[in-house]
Amino acid sequence: MKINRTQWIDYEQCKLDLVGKNVLIVDEVDDTRTTLHYALHELEKDAKEQAEAKGIDVSKIPEMKTNFGIFVLHDKLKPKKADLPDEILLDENRYFAAKQVPDKWYAYPWESTDIVYHTKMAIKQGNDIFFENEDEI
């Protein structure tokens, strides 16, 4: 099995073929869900176009259908502005959230240029990795 980590896909350059693959979309947070909705929609469209270009009808050859799953670190408990298909969202094998969290702003260390400031803000918000429970702070 080969794992490809990709942010923006240039199909020509990377020779990436989505047809018949299992694709996992990964994001830090399911906030408004608009990013996940957009990413899924675009990848589904790309997979369909690639299958058509190869003359593959996935309704007749179901094993060539591209399967999508989604993993997020944090699923914010709030109304979403966009939807995901029930076949993904309601399937525990296709939608994974490491943790459901309140609707707060979460700062991730890979987005910070100043780790000291980031850590201070994380502690202030009750999101320090050394504490299991916000009440311990």
Identify what each model region corresponds to.
Residues 1-25, 31-41:
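Short, glycine/charge-rich flexible loops or terminal/linker lids adjacent to PRPP-binding catalytic cores
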Residues 24-27, 71-73:
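Acidic beta-strand-to-loop metal/phosphate-binding motif
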Residues 30-31, 77:
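A short acidic, glycine/proline-enriched capping/turn motif at secondary-structure boundaries
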Residues 41-137:
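PRPP-dependent phosphoribosyltransferase catalytic core
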